[in-house]
């Protein structure tokens, strides 16, 4: 469907959430590989792809036709998913919301950390702020509410949870997710990659 004057939104329907996610990621990969004239950017999320284009070079109808032709086609080459092992200092000044998350779940802070570490978090897409890996697969026993009031500044590397999702803030920015830890690592995962968090006891000197 048209989405403004220079974009088309394609939404997957039917099947499981995993199947819808796989379908939109595959569609985005095929269109990107084809280097379609006029297409400027592709934003693939859980069940939709936003195809942004230069309206001086192509039209809604042409882009929609391209999407229909690409749907269901196999990706010519795929990159195996990477597993990222990410060190995290949990709690304290680096994870000030960990006690609140524990209360919400009826667990101890240590138990929350244990479940967070045991989870193989799957990167579904990168979002805002730019490049933030949006992950799911939570083993926590319930969804987590957002903060009542968003923070005006969340430090770079903060590890946060909300709902049944997890994110790492790649840059300092405002945010309303619950901060449970912080990592000194810099990573650039792609959709489909897996993130495993590993607890460390102190923030590295000089970072």
Where are these regions (language model features)?
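Glycine-rich active-site loops that engage anionic ligands at enzyme catalytic sites
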Residues: 1-207
């Amino acid at each position: 469907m048209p989405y403004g004057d220079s974009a088309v939104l394609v939404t997957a329907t039917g099947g499981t959430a995993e199947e819808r996610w796989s379908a939109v990621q595959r569609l985005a990969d095929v269109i990107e590989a084809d280097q379609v004239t006029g297409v400027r950017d592709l934003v693939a999320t859980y069940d939709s792809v936003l195809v942004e284009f230069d309206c001086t070079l192509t039209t809604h109808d042409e882009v929609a036709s391209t999407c229909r032709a690409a749907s269901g086609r196999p990706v010519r080459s795929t990159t195996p998913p990477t597993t990222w092992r990410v060190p995290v200092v949990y709690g304290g000044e680096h994870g000030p919301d960990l006690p609140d998350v524990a209360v919400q779940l009826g667990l101890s802070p240590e138990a929350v950390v244990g479940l967070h570490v045991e989870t193989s978090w799957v990167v579904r897409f990168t979002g805002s702020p730019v490049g933030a890996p949006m992950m799911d697969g939570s083993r926590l026993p319930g969804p987590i509410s957002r903060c009542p009031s968003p923070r005006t500044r969340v430090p770079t590397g903060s590890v946060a949870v909300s709902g049944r999702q997890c994110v790492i803030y790649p840059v300092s920015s405002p945010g309303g997710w619950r901060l449970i830890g912080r990592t000194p690592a810099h990573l650039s995962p792609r959709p489909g990659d897996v993130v495993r968090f590993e607890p460390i006891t102190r923030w590295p000197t000089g970072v």
